[in-house]
UniProtKB/Swiss-Prot annotation:
Part of the ABC transporter complex NikABCDE (Opp2) involved in nickel import. Probably responsible for the translocation of the substrate across the membrane. Required for full urease activity and plays a significant role in the virulence of S.aureus during urinary tract infection (UTI). The chain crosses the membrane at residues 10-30, 73-93, 108-128, 186-206, 238-258. One of its GO terms (cellular component) is plasma membrane. The keyword Transferase does not apply. InterPro entries: ABC_transport_permease, BP-dependent_transpt_permease, MetI-like, MetI-like_sf. The keyword Membrane applies. GO terms for biological process: nickel cation transport. It comes from Staphylococcus aureus (strain NCTC 8325 / PS 47). It is a multi-pass membrane protein. Its main location: membrane. Belongs to the binding-protein-dependent transport system permease family. OppBC subfamily. This is Nickel import system permease protein NikC.
Length: 276
């Protein structure tokens, strides 16, 4: 058991340290250097002045990655907020109200989840004009279904418990039951899913930008930087390796953090298996 806590604490420390470093670095770089073209400094090698060198327009790669983190992480957070608001709200009503509302939502989710979500995202993103804001819409229209299904499942398991029956018996308003009694039961599982999905959404945003459906030049964004670096993989591989490494490390950190949170949640519920 001690090993489990040690692992979780280490992962949490790495997670917090990563976020802290990203935030602090924002104050030491200029967004102007991320987009300003300087053709006299194209393909500069790695140095103290340019920690990762420069690209084909003379822009500092390190600065672009740090500023790109602002774009990627902000859009990811915004997308998650939209997903949670829509998904949890529908899940609460579907699980509590039952009847035709639940059946309609479940049938829609069954159809939506039967198709690979990334394919649908590509179709939706292609329908809109390429931009980061339209990626928020495209991803939200797909990812809310997982949160609705999870929320409904938890609500269903709580509906037959005495505290809900007593609240209904004393005619406690539905809004009060949903917000004060059921929502706290949902929050831990939703937080775990959010942390795990954070990495997935970063991957979706980067992938869609890589194929030209997200951020457009000269906006510094990790996926768009991958697309740009692809053309120089032989002559200047750092242009591809740097953003790819940042994406991979970020996704790994959030996935490990999500796993650690899930383990702790299961332990608190008394469901954790010591042999895990």
């Amino acid at each position: 058991m001690h090993k489990i806590f040690s692992k979780n604490n280490l992962i949490f420390f790495v997670f917090v340290a990563f976020i802290f470093v990203v935030i602090v670095l924002q104050f030491f770089v200029s967004s102007e250097n991320a987009t300003k073209v300087n053709l006299s400094q194209t393909f500069e090698p790695i140095s103290w002045l340019h920690l990762l060198g420069t690209d084909d327009y003379g822009r500092d790669l390190f600065t672009r990655i740090i500023i790109g983190a602002r774009s990627t992480l902000f859009v990811t957070v915004l997308t998650l907020i939209a997903i949670v608001v829509i998904g949890v709200t529908l899940g609460l009503f579907a699980g509590y109200k039952k009847g035709w509302i639940e059946r309609l939502v479940l049938r829609f989710i069954d159809v939506g989840l039967s198709i690979p979500e990334f394919i649908i995202m590509i179709a939706l993103a292609s329908f809109f004009q390429p931009s980061l804001w339209n990626l928020v819409i495209s991803i939200t229209l797909i990812k809310w279904m997982n949160y609705t299904r999870l929320t409904r499942s938890i609500v269903n398991s709580e509906m037959n418990k005495p505290y809900i029956k007593m609240a209904q018996l004393f005619h406690v308003p539905t809004r009060t039951i949903l917000i004060r009694h059921l929502t706290p039961k949902i929050i831990p599982a939703i937080i775990v899913l959010m942390v795990v999905d954070f990495g997935k959404i970063i991957l979706y945003i980067s992938s869609l930008s890589f194929i030209g459906l997200g951020a457009q030049p000269p906006t510094p964004e990790w996926g768009a930087m991958l697309q740009q670096g692809r053309d120089f993989i032989s002559s200047h591989p750092i242009m591809l390796i740097a953003p790819a490494s940042v994406i991979a490390i970020t996704i790994l950190i959030f996935n490990l953090t999500g796993d650690a949170l899930r383990d702790r949640l299961l332990k608190q519920r008394g469901e954790y298996d010591e042999s895990h």
